[in-house]
Amino acid sequence: NNILNEKTLDIFVQNQVQIAQNELENQKNQALSLALMFSKNQDIINNLEKNNHIELKKELLKLLNIIKTYTKNSIDIQIHTKYLEVFTRSWEDVDFGLKLDSFREGLVKVRNSNEPYVSTELGKRFNIKAIAPIYNHNNLFIGSIEVIVDFNPLINRLKGLGIDSMILLEKDYLNIATYHSDNPKLGDYLILQSSFSKNLLDILIKNPNFLKNDSFYYETDEKVFTQIPLGEFENSSVGVL
């Protein structure tokens, strides 16, 4: 009976992990679709080529206002030059000209491959980043556009499917992910979003070994805990779901 129950639980956890991974892929694909669509926007292309920060930002804000009529998800957009420098951001007016190639692996990948790319990537923030190359009318690479989506839609979607979850970032990456420096800590991690049950956090505080990856899952009387790796930086895990 115990062996049978264990096998049943193994299958259950595997199924729940697959559900979570599928939902994460859905979020990433939605972000990538937006990035690809915006990369063809003629106003974005022209303003980037003419080095017009102000008009380009106006266009980004206009697009985001249109998107808000269809979704409650929080979306940010960043434009980069062909040298992987910050050109403009929808959410702030700082860091213009900042070179990003030293810590933004996704940007380097897009520039080198000329292919779009989406991942859970580390930057000043840890979130879903979808990047598409931008080409001018001569089909020359002039920069890239990045659609940034936080994890709250994923957490809320999983909650609707009966899965309590939270996003944890490795504390070692705070020197890069400076935006999260004031986030609450949990063991060797930082908690990235607040839309999870207090019960989930209380159990993890009482059972710190659940944060380790020594077992496929951990079990209490009321919950089963497992984790899914999120993102990589220099071949090391950045965070977990």
Which residue ranges define each predicted feature?
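Short, hydrophobic beta-strand elements of compact beta-sandwich sensory domains
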Residues: 141-150, 224-241
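Membrane-proximal N-terminal soluble sensing/regulatory segments of transmembrane proteins
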Residues: 47-53, 137-147, 157-160, 165-171
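Intrinsic low-complexity, intrinsically disordered coil/linker regions enriched in small/polar
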Residues: 153-222
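Stable alpha-helical elements in mature extracytoplasmic
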Residues: 56-59, 63, 103, 154-157
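Juxtamembrane extracytoplasmic/periplasmic/luminal helical "stalk" adjacent to the first N-terminal
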Residues: 1-55, 65-75, 115-116, 160-164, ...
